[in-house]
């Protein structure tokens, strides 16, 4: 749990730092995986983003072995998003002239995502993100948005653990 929790701090710091510089998610993941923990943390600090630096301040003076373990846990979580070409293409930062999907797209469009059973192991992390972000969007919809949204998940149990309890609590009936 220690490595996972602190690895998430590194990821959060990188996302805040580099997204604020205009980078896309895939570019951030590739940069993250392309650097050791020392190079990554030094580069984040060099950007002088105070919010990003708050997330990594706990690594100052920490054991190098523990910090490397945290980075490895984070690398394991991000590998799919930096190495799989189909995922990279789906999640890349869209050009301004390209259509893209956001949770708000669900207000006016039908979106179908089909993943064959044999690919669930590979794309499970992506499906968990899509599900969690959609649920978060549903729970924060403004009250004036009255149109009902039907959200169906086939084989929900095969997704594994989803962190959606908080979003479900906030959903309107």
Locate predicted features.
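P-loop NTPase motor domains
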Residues: 1-173
